[in-house]
A protein has these predicted regions:
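Sec-dependent N-terminal signal peptides
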Residues: 4-15
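Extended soluble regions of mature proteins
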Residues: 22-199
Length: 199
């Protein structure tokens, strides 16, 4: 069940990122940002998302507690791959083909908005009005699994439930079009990454 909800969360991240402005066909509608999040539900904690080049480079750092276990982790998407590792266990990590690239390429060959809406429909989630969070007017996407708020392709809030598992994430601050240090997108050379299948 945990694996299923993690897969859904990754899909929601990727799909919200795929809602970029049609003119630029990039993951997000703004060039750069630093966003702080809190997590709730079965996993609690905090996270910080850094991105540049309209999301073509992104890094998410999380410190969370789940079932009494504390964990730290980086998820860095840059180029063809998305890499994940725990800074406290730097010997090995995981990587997968960056799902955004194929989805963006597919979207650019057809009707962009229809593609995004169809992708959400497959998850049973549909656009449902607007809500404001941190001064940003967000699209509301709802379904049986829960609700997501999206602004310029950026996930601002998420509430999901699957079986007895719940997952929440909410932006607590956002700085847009700021300078993001390149160090956040560097993959450590001392880590051996095992490749996992993509979507």
């Amino acid at each position: 069940m945990k694996k299923s909800i993690v897969t859904v969360v990754i899909l929601v991240y990727a799909l919200t990122a795929a809602q970029a402005q049609e003119q630029i066909l990039k993951p997000y509608g703004i060039k750069s940002a630093i966003i702080e999040y809190t997590y709730s539900g079965d996993k609690t904690g905090t996270g910080t998302l850094y991105f540049d080049d309209y999301g073509m480079k992104s890094a998410l750092y999380m410190e969370t507690i789940m079932e009494g276990e504390e964990s730290k982790g980086w998820v860095v998407a840059f180029g063809d791959y998305q890499s994940m590792w725990d800074p406290d266990q730097p010997d090995d990590g995981m990587k997968m083909k960056n799902p955004l690239l194929s989805w963006i390429n597919e979207a650019s060959n057809g009707d962009y908005e229809s593609f995004t809406e169809e992708a959400y429909k497959k998850m049973g989630m549909f656009k449902s009005g607007k809500e404001t969070l941190l001064g940003k007017e967000c699209d509301v996407i709802k379904g049986d699994m829960g609700k997501v708020l999206v602004w310029n392709g950026i996930m601002m809030m998420m509430e999901l439930k699957m079986g007895g598992y719940s997952s929440g994430q909410k932006a607590t601050s956002i700085k847009t079009n700021v300078a993001v240090e390149p160090k956040y997108f560097i993959i450590p050379k001392n880590i051996t990454f095992s490749e996992m299948p993509g979507f």
